[in-house]
Amino acid sequence: MMNSRDSITRRELLQRLALLTGATLVPWRAFGALEPAPSDKLGPVLPLRPLGKTGLKVTMLAVGGSHIGRPPESEAQAVIEAAIANGIRTFDTAELYQNGGSEERYGKFLTPKYREHVLIFTKTMAEDAATARNHLEGSLRRMKTDYIDLWQLHDVRMMDKADVRVHGVLDVMLKAKAEGKVRHIGFTGHASWKTHAHVLELTDAFETCLMPINVADPSYESFTLNVLPILLQRNMGAMAMKTLAADGLMGGRGGTGPRIIPDRLSVHEALRYVWSLPVSTLVSGMASVAHLKANVASARSFIAMSEADRQALVAKVADVAQSGEMERGFKGQTGS
């Protein structure tokens, strides 16, 4: 595995990307990155992708729940309704978001009408069994459902905490799965690929992983180069977040950093790059209907990039991305 803090040349970066695509994307191509867009009782559905070994099929675009809990309730309801109307059937959230507020909005606007048609994912920040069980029961209650499709260990950051959290919570997750309260289990994090790799060394029980994947990632502390191959080897569902580097590609939240978008590439190109990798879904925080519709348009017009085009896009931003500045808002944030 590479140490992304080491300075690497453009040629070395492209060689590493070529090794990734050559060694790990063959199985992905074999079972197909996309299925034809289906329809259900609610209307046309976005193209589906398999979620690793879970047997679930997820829409290539998923709603990120943190943004559902932020705006006024009427706007959150509008985003949920627009997501359904535009073919999204995969919804992610977490017990942490707005202290359960995001889950409550799913329970108010999503599950009463659409539960049988959607997949709902949530997460727990628990470090011990009792807290994990309380979080699970609270999530089920707030979302007004008797099962969760994917329950995830949320935001695993520090290496030593990873041991504590996995050993403290995994048995509860497995028991909840046996009880039918959750269908599948996974873990998430965005601070350190090394911690992700450590979690994967601790256990093979997790079925999915949600992590940062974006055009800047291969150049700095890369999840794509260091974790994605392991997920593919284990047939785990790889899910992408921070696909615009938490706005880091657009100068950051304050707009003072380097602007990759729109100076060097478009939002559509950035999303297309991610979808061209072997990810099951792209989880996006979409706080407005307009934002959601723009992302849906990119999904519906998606044509996979060639290996050469992916490498060219990474190389196009590598000189800025190698410093890590664009991703500093989440990578390396390993505090408890």
Regions found by a protein language model. Give the residues of each.
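N-terminal secretory signal peptides and thylakoid transit peptides that target proteins
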Residues: 2-21
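Glycine-rich, proline-tolerant flexible connector loops at the mouths of alpha/beta enzymes
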Residues: 92-109
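Structured C-terminal cap/extension of enzyme domains
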Residues: 202, 224-336
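Glycine/proline-rich, positively charged
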Residues: 127-239, 290
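Conserved, mostly hydrophobic/aromatic
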Residues: 51, 63, 91, 106, ...
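Active-site mouth loops of central-metabolism enzymes
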Residues: 64-74, 122-130, 255-262
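C-terminal segment of N-terminal export signals and the immediately downstream linker at the start
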Residues: 28-61, 68-69
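Acidic (Asp/Glu)-rich catalytic clusters
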Residues: 52-55, 107-115, 139-145, 200-204
